[in-house]
């Protein structure tokens, strides 16, 4: 055995011979470079453990440098000193790496997706995949699901929450479902996302408290307890039209054209004291047609106790209180539900949304027009009503960003 330390210069100068030969390194006992007749050079480490000889493959030169080969051989010697076989240890680590690869977050998420997609509409499935690919996979996709902590997920959610709070809540639910799947399939022992809903900022209850569009199914179920069909219809119309509560309460049949599917509100009932044309979705028209059978003999769409008076200002809030939504939802809050869902979708001009709310956007040029963007707003309102129907049917929200 040579007592001369091996050098990179000597390795590079080593020429192939008719038979394989070794270049040993006196600084690292057991380490040698095997030079093959075809010119390839392989690092090997020979050692003895429990009176048996073993040969460990360390790598190919020059991919594995002399310095790196020495480091790896030294690590192996440390294992041997502790009674651990480096070859067996390498096999175990390779098996663990393979297991971690199989339990990579993206792989688990795709398996979860495959089990759920059969019950979803095509559009909803596309939304779920888009959210995963856009917001989740770039951060967590390549990591082993075993190593992902609640802190990791929270950092992802808080970043999303700064620009799209409702989307952050949806991501939390989806990531949580993926971890539930991982628990069921015994890849992890617990779901680190379980308590993160309390870590995100709560929607502030108050004067104009609102709920996201995703929570409408639970609300509609509770609404059935409101008692009065008229009150139920009024609240459903608030949701579908984004009208202010006062605008709906004071609405008269003479302002409604069911054939053209519009409500034309005069300036005197509008906050901005300008007339306002509201396009109606098919679902809103159907509700009004049904309401006409109850109140068509009154001037008001929603009369109060007396036929010549409108519904009282407190009627809707009292109904919400009766069904358990006090400080959770308000009549005015449905306007926030509407604007949040459409703005977050990214599909509609903010001007259309603002005009539908009877706001006058600062960026709109020219004189305010009561019927501005009517065609676009009509299509937008139909999309919104259809999205609510889709959510109620359990098919997800087609307005979610792609």
Curated annotation (Swiss-Prot):
InterPro entries: CB, DNA_brk_join_enz, Integrase-like_cat_sf, Integrase_catalytic, Integrase_DNA-bd_sf, Integrase_DNA_bind_dom, Integrase_recombinase_N, Phage_int_M. SUPFAM superfamilies: DNA breaking-rejoining enzymes. Coiled coil: none annotated. GO terms for biological process: DNA recombination; provirus excision; symbiont entry into host cell; viral genome integration into host DNA. CDD domains: INT_P4_C. Residues 103-183 form the Core-binding (CB) domain. GO terms for molecular function: DNA binding; prophage integrase activity. Residues 206-381 form the Tyr recombinase domain. Keywords: DNA integration, DNA recombination, DNA-binding, Viral genome integration, Virus entry into host cell. It holds the Pfam family Phage_integrase. The active site is at 244, 271, 332, 335, 359, 368 (o-(3'-phospho-dna)-tyrosine intermediate). The keyword Ion transport does not apply. PANTHER family: PROPHAGE INTEGRASE, PROPHAGE INTEGRASE INTS-RELATED. Belongs to the 'phage' integrase family. Integrase is necessary for integration of the phage into the host genome by site-specific recombination. In conjunction with excisionase, integrase is also necessary for excision of the prophage from the host genome. This is Prophage integrase IntZ. The gene is intZ.
